[in-house]
């Protein structure tokens, strides 16, 4: 028995030594905090609580440190008076309702140097304006504030500030110092809260702004208010304005916001009370220059209720989505819209007139009080849905062509006079024009473009360019001439089309390194994407790879550099090929081991201008040098083999441009961004040696270790092993 007792004591001691323990100073703080909040036993490890997350201080230590607090609502209100500064590795802190922070916490918050996120669902402490927040703090979420928000919050390094559900006593500073760090701001606004008059200047890098407007006129002492003179948000991408749903909302004009967001991508408006300024009479967003397109989402709003004429105008290719709004389609200027969605609109009316909407590609109107006919003009819409309305007129010919089985998915249920689920396809006007272009690319993305009348929307290998009148038939990879394909149209009609693949065309060459191997690449079109390509270089036939790339880019074929004949620098060599029985052009290139551009990216003015480009160009012969941007030639005004100057053309603002430097057929690409006016920023300087087309490659699968995994056996496994050993030994002595 003595031996058993001794072994048991040894086992307990061993396990205590093998287990990780929390840092003593943190243990004291957390034990007291958890006990006062939830009655948590002070003898227990706080790290074992569901409210606390701990981790090893480092990979070799068994000492635990608190990294996250998630404190749920206690039975009674509690003010955290404990000094939390020992929690030096705390990164995340979330406090539910009835838990309050103190002034002392914020006076010492800069000592929590790894704190990244604070979420507090009850907030009643006035933070001093001289408070310094840690540089690590990125997100501060405040719910139910009942005190003024300190200017220190708005002047910190915080990137994301979210404020919700204000209580009496809440207010916002009316002037804020310039803060380049804040990117996402969410603020409630009431008639008593105030609003920063210089918000656009104070936050020059603000990306997303959400304003919650409390506009309940039934609230005690409530009165009208508005926000104006906010300035221009030069970098704002998203604007979200939401109004408290109310039976008695105030009228709140938002023109001051909507006229100052030149580059937003997203606009969301929710709730009753929002209006168009009667002195302006229109919301004109056509000036907005989104990076891609502007998405407009209006939900349960009074914005367009009493509009007069075309009161809402969007920028080109905008999305417009409406849910539970009551408005006339006459309010909307459709000329720039690409997508229009309207659900649950109780305004009785006909379908919108889209004769002057050339960009409109998609229409979905559902669960709305639209009546009358479906116009023939709707046959050109590529994505169309008119289900669950009250359309009681006639369906157009393109729907009749499909019959109830297929066309019903687009326009039923509706009480149409000439169309229902059992209608048979009727299409006497189905017609295919014979003058289509029958040359297609070899990369499998090539299309036969056909035109006609009532062709439908889809079919096998068919997609719409303009529904019913212009369709694209996808042709598989291949080479050669005199091919054919048979397709079935949406109305069941079958047709066979003849085509040939484009002949090969050689454009340029370059070099590519993959997995420490160097390849010569030849770029062009019409290569074989299924079989190796045979290239003739100076009369010698050499086998290159299957073509890669394609699509919007040229194809690329590759040859290991050690299989290439030896050439001296600037040596001429001729290149040609034969693909699918079709001969390419024969080109003369000049051989260079390397051509590169020092800049990683060029940023140019959209008005055009002059710019220097540095690099190693391999030759002093300017006659071998040409430069273009997306196919538009640039004038080389000055040249050495390490620096050149070009006059570049004007382009629309965007970052999807490519500059191609061609030296004797050796092509190097460089990403180009066009910006609005101003000075051209200094380019970054990572050398570019990219060939004109870079293939997509999949990295080899390489085993990796998880962070902190040094490959050694875990402490849990070691403890388990010794525990089993001790138990086995114990059994021998019983």
From Swiss-Prot:
InterPro entries: LRR_dom_sf (IPR032675), Sexual_fusion_gp (IPR053133). The lineage of its organism: Eukaryota, Amoebozoa, Evosea, Eumycetozoa, Dictyostelia. One of its GO terms (biological process) is sexual macrocyst formation. The keyword Cell membrane applies. One of its GO terms (cellular component) is side of membrane. A lipid is attached at residue 708 (GPI-like-anchor amidated glycine). It is found in: Cell membrane. Sequence repeats lie at residues 683-686, 687-690, 691-694, 695-698. Residues 683-698 are annotated as: 4 X 4 AA tandem repeats of P-S-T-T. Residues 678-712 are annotated as: Disordered. Residues 709-734 form a propeptide. This is Cell surface glycoprotein gp138B. Its main location: membrane. It comes from the Eukaryota. Involved in the sexual cell fusion of D.discoideum.
């Amino acid at each position: 028995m003595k031996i058993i007792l001794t072994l048991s004591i040894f086992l307990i001691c061993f396990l205590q030594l093998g287990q990780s323990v929390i840092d003593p100073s943190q243990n004291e703080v957390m034990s007291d905090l958890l006990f006062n909040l939830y009655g948590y036993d002070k003898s227990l490890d706080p790290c074992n609580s569901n409210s606390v997350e701990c981790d090893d201080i480092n990979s070799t230590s068994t000492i635990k440190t608190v990294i996250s607090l998630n404190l749920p609502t206690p039975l009674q209100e509690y003010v955290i008076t404990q000094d939390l500064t020992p929690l030096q590795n705390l990164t995340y802190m979330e406090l539910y309702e009835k838990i309050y922070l103190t002034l002392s916490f914020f006076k010492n918050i800069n000592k929590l140097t790894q704190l990244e996120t604070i979420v507090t669902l009850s907030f009643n402490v006035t933070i001093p304006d001289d408070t310094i927040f840690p540089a690590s703090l990125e997100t501060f979420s405040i719910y139910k504030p009942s005190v003024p928000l300190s200017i220190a919050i708005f002047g910190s390094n915080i990137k994301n500030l979210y404020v919700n559900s204000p209580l009496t006593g809440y207010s916002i500073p009316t002037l804020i110092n310039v803060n380049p760090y804040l990117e996402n701001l969410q603020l409630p606004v009431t008639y008593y809260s105030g609003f920063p008059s210089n918000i656009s200047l104070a936050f020059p890098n603000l990306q997303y702004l959400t304003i919650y407007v409390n506009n309940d006129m039934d609230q005690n002492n409530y009165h009208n208010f508005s926000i104006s003179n906010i300035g221009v948000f030069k970098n704002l991408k998203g604007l979200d304005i939401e109004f408290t749903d109310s039976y008695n909302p105030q009228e709140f004009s938002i023109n001051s916001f909507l006229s100052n967001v030149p580059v937003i991508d997203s606009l969301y408006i929710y709730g009753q009370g929002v209006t168009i300024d009667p002195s302006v009479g229109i919301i004109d967003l056509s000036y907005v220059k989104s990076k891609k397109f502007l998405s407009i989402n209006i939900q349960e709003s009074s914005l367009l209720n009493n509009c007069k004429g075309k009161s809402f105008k969007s920028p080109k290719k905008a999305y417009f989505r409406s849910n539970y709004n009551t408005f006339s389609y006459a309010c909307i200027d459709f000329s720039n819209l690409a997508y229009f969605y309207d659900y649950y609109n109780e305004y009785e009316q006909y379908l919108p007139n889209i004769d002057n909407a050339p960009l409109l590609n998609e229409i979905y109107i559902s669960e709305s009080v639209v009546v009358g006919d479906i116009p023939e003009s709707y046959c050109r819409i590529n994505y169309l849905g008119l289900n669950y309305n009250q359309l009681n007129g006639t369906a157009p010919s393109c729907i009749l062509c499909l019959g109830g089985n297929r066309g019903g998915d687009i326009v039923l249920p509706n009480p149409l006079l000439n169309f229902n689920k059992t209608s048979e396809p009727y299409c006497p006007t189905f017609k295919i024009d014979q003058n289509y272009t029958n040359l297609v690319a070899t990369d499998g993305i090539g299309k036969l473009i056909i035109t006609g009348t009532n062709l439908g929307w889809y079919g096998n290998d068919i997609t719409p360019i303009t529904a019913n009148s212009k369709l694209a038939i996808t042709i598989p990879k291949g080479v050669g001439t005199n091919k054919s394909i048979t397709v079935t149209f949406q109305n069941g009609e079958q047709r066979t089309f003849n085509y040939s693949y484009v002949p090969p065309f050689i454009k340029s060459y370059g070099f590519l390194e993959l997995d420490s191997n160097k390849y010569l690449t030849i770029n062009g079109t019409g290569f074989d994407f299924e079989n190796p390509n045979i290239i003739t270089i100076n009369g010698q036939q050499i086998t290159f790879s299957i073509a890669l790339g394609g699509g919007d880019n040229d194809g690329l074929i590759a040859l290991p550099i050690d299989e290439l004949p030896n050439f001296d620098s600037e040596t001429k060599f001729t290149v040609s090929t034969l693909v699918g029985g079709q001969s390419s052009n024969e080109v003369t290139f000049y051989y260079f081991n390397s051509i590169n551009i020092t800049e990683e990216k060029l940023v140019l003015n959209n008005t055009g201008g002059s710019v220097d480009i540095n690099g190693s160009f391999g030759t002093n012969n300017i006659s071998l040098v040409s430069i273009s941007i997306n196919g538009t030639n640039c004038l080389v005004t000055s040249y050495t083999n390490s620096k050149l100057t070009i006059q570049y053309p004007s382009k629309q603002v965007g970052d999807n441009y490519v500059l191609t430097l061609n030296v004797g057929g050796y092509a190097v690409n460089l990403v180009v961004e066009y910006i609005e006016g101003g000075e051209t920023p200094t380019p970054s300087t990572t050398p570019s040696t990219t060939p004109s087309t870079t293939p997509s490659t999949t990295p080899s699968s390489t085993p990796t270790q998880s962070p902190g995994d040094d490959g050694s056996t875990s402490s849990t496994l070691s403890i388990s092993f010794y525990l089993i050993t001790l138990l086995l030994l114990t059994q021998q002595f019983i």
